[in-house]
Design a protein with these regions (language model features):
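Small cysteine-rich, disulfide-bonded extracellular modules of the LU/uPAR three-finger superfamily
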Residues: 1-86, 93-133
Length: 133
């Protein structure tokens, strides 16, 4: 089942708030929006540092495409089965705020010696406003 959600601060203040505060990108197994931050942390299976230069903005027609760079060669700290929901998350480890969670391809992830994985980039769009109805 696809898991996609964002924090109310992200919705209210846009990607600038997350870009200024988020310091980590991670692969998470079976995330739930209502998870406490401690529960969320327990679901992280791989993570990497994130900085403001990892955020890219590009016009896309009337919309704005936002891409957050993925990370490669990450040593996993946990495992996932192909039946688990895997998602990419962007969060602030100091402020304990999960800004974005975006569904990723579910697959088996092992944590054997020498295993590495790639955390995919997140891509989303800020849409042009729509007419009043």
């Amino acid at each position: 089942m696809a898991v996609n959600y964002s924090h109310s601060d992200f919705k209210r203040y846009g990607p600038d708030r997350a870009q200024q505060n988020a310091d980590t990108i991670a692969l998470v197994v079976n995330p739930v929006k209502s998870d406490t931050f401690a529960a969320f942390q327990g679901k992280i299976i791989a993570q990497a540092a994130l900085s403001s230069v990892d955020w890219n903005y590009a016009p896309n027609g009337e919309d704005l495409q936002v891409t957050i760079n993925g990370k490669s060669g990450i040593d996993p700290s946990g495992t996932a089965a192909d039946t688990d929901d895997i998602a990419v998350a962007v969060f602030d480890s100091v402020g304990e705020t999960v800004y974005l969670v975006q569904d990723a391809t579910d697959r088996n992830i092992t944590n054997d010696a020498g295993d590495t994985l790639n955390i995919p980039a997140l891509v989303f769009y800020i849409r042009e406003v729509t007419p009043v109805v």
